[in-house]
Amino acid sequence: MSEKYITLEELCGLLSITKATGRNWLRLGKIESQKQIDGQEYFSEEYALYIRNALVSGEFDSLKSRRNKKYVSGKAFYDKYVSDNCGSRETVFELAGGLIESDEAMTDTAMRVILADCALKQLISVDNLENMEGLQDREEEILSIYIENNMDIGCWKRLIDDIIDDKDKARIWINENKDLLRVHYDYQPGEDVLGLLYMSIKDIGSRKAAGSYYTPTDVVKQMVSGIVENLYNTVEKNDAGHMRVLDPCCGTGNFLIQLSKVIPLGQIYACDIDELSVQLARFNLALTSSYQCKKEKAISKTSLNIEDLNKIYDNITCRNFLTKEDTEDIYFDVIIGNPPWGYAFDCDMRDYLHKKYRTAGRRGIESYDVFVERSLELLADGGVLEFVLPEAILDVRNHRDVRQVIADNSDIGRVRFVGDVFHGVQCPAITLQLVKSSAPGHTEGAAIERNGQKFVICNDRHLSPDGFQVRLSDEEYEVLLRLENTGNCTSLRGQADFALGIVTGDNKKYISVELQNGMEPVVTGADVYRYGHDKCDKYILSGFDRYQQAAPEKLYRAPEKLIYRFINRQLVFAYDDRQMATLNSCNIVIPHIQGLKMKYVMAVLNSRIAQYIYEKRYNSVKVLRSHIESIPIPLADEEIQAQLIRMVDHLIECPRDNAEEKCKLYDDIDDIVRQLYGVNSADYEFIKNALSGCKYML
């Protein structure tokens, strides 16, 4: 059979790196292609898997890079997952800590034994099973007693046996590691203790490669509560008993635990590709449902009958949600969950997804985008989808396709901005609720919760694939539209040169804090403030063709140019007429708008009006070229420009330690700019108060 080859782009997707990083690795010899066709590099699938495994194992030096933390391995306590008052929280913490200290290898058998022990002890704590007297001080023997068939647990046997899997291997492991089972667990209603334990002992590297970031219980409770309320308000009472609810990426069943309190057992469906997670989810669902029944009927035992057990096995399955079956699909009234983020699909699955899904583009596949598309396909008309997703899905360019799918099939019902909810993951998240609609693409009536504030969008904003404007109140949005549609304006689109700062490829090698022969000062983003920049304290070798990435030198040497902070939530532009080089944290724009002076354009870009447009339209920490090009620039006459430029020159010349004078000058300039936009005093006060920060950055 012939060797299968993949492109550089596909290799980058497999390694979870950008294409730019892949090109750099290729250029630097960190990776090697196996053949070239028409100038394009190709890599054998065997080689691609070798590189990926080298990253996972740490053999590949680039693993040490900050950008490749995805492949770091180890065990860690997932402290945001359960409620603070969960009684087993400290128990799991101590066990996980002990495993880290002992550097115990977490084999599949080890994980299964530890998890089965936890499941069995939770069941015992609820039911007070017979023959358990006297074992409180011999916790390490309980699972062994069960394995040797000295404990009758009825229908629960199938669930516990599935978790154990191989009893012979379990016996051997227990004999060698009894101390690790000297742990007590009590059943905690509404808490996924098994999930907490599983995440805390599972290899972090494999968890991240699978995109597994399990949802904290408080977020799950909010989602389930809101979606059930929404559903029962829209579904006829007679139809409520026929509703189907699906978690397509159920993990260990945290959503199922909360759903089973309000949805009948037979109406709950779930799936996942992790077999052990599914087995734990089945146990969790069975125990929660049985405990609910025990409470409601005031009986002494948790009642799990064969009929309920069969429902659980029929409805909670180990399968790939994204694989479309030939048989007719079942439609659901609710789909809820937390789809995987950044899952590393293999080559065959990527090929399959490319053929089946609009969101599976050739430039890379984001797993949660495809989950949203598939879920909307399986949602009944009027049905509700609610997922935990990165906030980036609202407006980042890479997610344009999924926004188009959403706009073509649904309306937005609710958005909650929940911040960095996942342990060890710095990525702001949202819970996004969509309602399947035959007349889709609307936001009217959407409930928004952000930064402690709640509001409802009353005036509809049609959903655009370019970005979903749901962060703003109606008043903020109306002001934004007025500014963007100001008359007598132009823009920098097609009327400016843009350039990135220099990427050296090795800052330790090429950048010095001392001026040496052949070196010149270089401006960094941290040096730049509005209208000027600090004296440089870094130096770089001249001759920019030696570096990994540099713009044509004539752009750095332009007689005058504007430089700006690339990574920043505020627009910060400075004037440079000394032909300075800049690093990649500091980019360049050279306006060529006929009739408009460069310092005048700088005054507009540094204004609160421009900041409002940038902040409210894009909510970005990166100032992109497209952001700058979108800002309307008023066409001022020569007299007004001259007046502003005199004030700008005065501000530039004003010493930095004279903060009061600089701020007054900034405010005076800003007042003229706002009048050019036609902004009255009341709207100007609103704009100033609506900005997230009041820093002058002077």
Predicted regions mapped to residue ranges:
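Charged, often flexible domain-edge or linker segments that flank or initiate folded functional domains
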Residues: 1-166, 209-326, 330, 691
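Signature of N6-adenine DNA methyltransferases within the class I
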Residues: 1-8, 15-16, 30, 34-42, ...
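Generic, well-ordered alpha-helical scaffold segments in large soluble proteins
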Residues: 18, 196, 200, 204, ...
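Polybasic, glycine- and aromatic-enriched phosphate-binding surface used to engage nucleic acids
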Residues: 18-20, 24, 479-642
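Active-site-adjacent bridging/hinge elements
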Residues: 84-97, 191-205, 259-260, 344-353, ...
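Structural motif
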Residues: 98-115, 123, 127, 186-191, ...
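Class I S-adenosyl-L-methionine
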Residues: 156-230, 610-616, 625
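Non-catalytic DNA-recognition/assembly elements of restriction-modification systems
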Residues: 463-507, 519, 526, 635-698
